[in-house]
């Protein structure tokens, strides 16, 4: 049986559960796919050229995580779907010798929400994940605000119709989303007292990090407000990516079931 290689580019990458859940799917569906896929974690030096690495490693597809999602958008031969709007790519697929970029973070995040009746959201951070979330939430009719410590990237959100801030706005928000990398450094993304104020008036604290109780989620738990980590988003975006890797032979719902069973 033919072997195909896949992977996930990131820095850091050792925390990623993507190899676990994708390899479970490649094993489960190998007969239907007609090939055996193997999915590797790939630690990419910050200065690396993603496309060169992808081709050098002979990959058929890959996911892209922190901090490469915006750079991945720039190196694709073709961009499809909502990735065109959000300027960030988390899924790369070799299609007819062209490197095609997709974004499954956007829909993956929305599918992971247990309820869908939020009116507005505050996104902390302005990177590739934040862009994907803002695009999807705007598409779903929410008012979106973005708070970032610097002006970097905020022009994108302004063009999207988001309210942008470099200082914490004095407003209440239903959804407070941590899309920064602070949790990976075991830090809060924002001043503790300011965050407490948002949590006390909010309906859900959501951290894109997964696998441990982050300082962000720990504070929400302490204040007894609903909170959610990024585990379900990871599985949904991975299942949507797997559908692309399988050339749509395996619907994301089937991939999700397998991935959920192992993680």
Swiss-Prot record:
Its EC number(s): 1.1.1.25
GO terms of biological process kind: amino acid biosynthetic process; aromatic amino acid family biosynthetic process; chorismate biosynthetic process; shikimate metabolic process
Keywords, comma-separated and alphabetical: Amino-acid biosynthesis, Aromatic amino acid biosynthesis, NADP, Oxidoreductase
Name of this chain's protein: Shikimate dehydrogenase (NADP(+))
Pfam family, any one: Shikimate_dh_N
Binding-site residues, NADP(+): 125-129, 208, 230
Disulfide bridge partners, by residue number: none
Pathway assigned to this chain's UniProt record: Metabolic intermediate biosynthesis; chorismate biosynthesis; chorismate from D-erythrose 4-phosphate and phosphoenolpyruvate: step 4/7
The organism of origin for this protein: Helicobacter pylori (strain P12)
Binding positions (shikimate): 16-18, 65, 90, 105, 210
Protein's UniProt keywords contain Membrane: no
InterPro entries with a match to the protein in the record: Aminoacid_DH-like_N_sf, NAD(P)-bd_dom_sf, Shikimate_DH, Shikimate_DH-bd_N, Shikimate_DH_fam
Entry's Gene Ontology molecular function annotations: NADP binding; shikimate 3-dehydrogenase (NADP+) activity
Subunit structure: Homodimer.
GO CC list: cytosol
Cited HAMAP family: Shikimate_DH_AroE (MF_00222)
Enzyme class at the top of the EC tree: oxidoreductase
Active-site residues, Swiss-Prot/TrEMBL: 69 (proton acceptor)
């Amino acid at each position: 049986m033919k072997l195909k290689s896949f992977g996930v580019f990131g820095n850091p990458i050792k925390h990623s559960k993507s190899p676990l859940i994708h390899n479970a799917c490649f094993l489960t569906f190998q007969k239907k796919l007609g090939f055996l896929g193997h999915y590797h974690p790939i630690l990419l030096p910050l200065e690396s050229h993603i496309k060169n690495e992808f081709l050098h490693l002979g990959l058929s597809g890959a996911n892209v995580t922190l901090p490469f999602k915006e750079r991945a958008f720039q190196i694709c031969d073709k961009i499809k779907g909502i990735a065109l709007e959000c300027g960030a790519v988390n899924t790369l697929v070799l299609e007819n010798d062209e490197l095609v970029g997709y974004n499954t973070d956007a829909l993956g995040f929305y599918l992971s929400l247990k309820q869908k009746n939020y009116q507005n959201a505050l996104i902390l951070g302005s990177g590739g994940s934040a862009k994907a979330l803002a695009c999807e939430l705007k598409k779903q009719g929410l008012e979106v605000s973005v708070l970032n410590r610097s002006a970097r990237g905020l022009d994108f959100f302004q063009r999207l119709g988001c309210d942008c801030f470099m200082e914490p706005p004095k407003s209440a928000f239903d959804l407070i989303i941590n899309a920064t990398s602070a949790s990976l450094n075991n830090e809060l993304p924002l001043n503790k007292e300011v965050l407490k104020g948002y949590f006390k008036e909010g309906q859900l604290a959501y951290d894109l990090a997964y696998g441990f109780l982050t300082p962000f989620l720990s504070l929400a738990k302490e204040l007894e407000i609903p909170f959610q980590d990024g585990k379900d988003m990871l599985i949904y975006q991975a299942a949507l990516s797997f559908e692309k890797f399988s050339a749509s032979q395996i619907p994301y719902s089937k991939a999700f079931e397998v991935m959920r069973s192992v993680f």
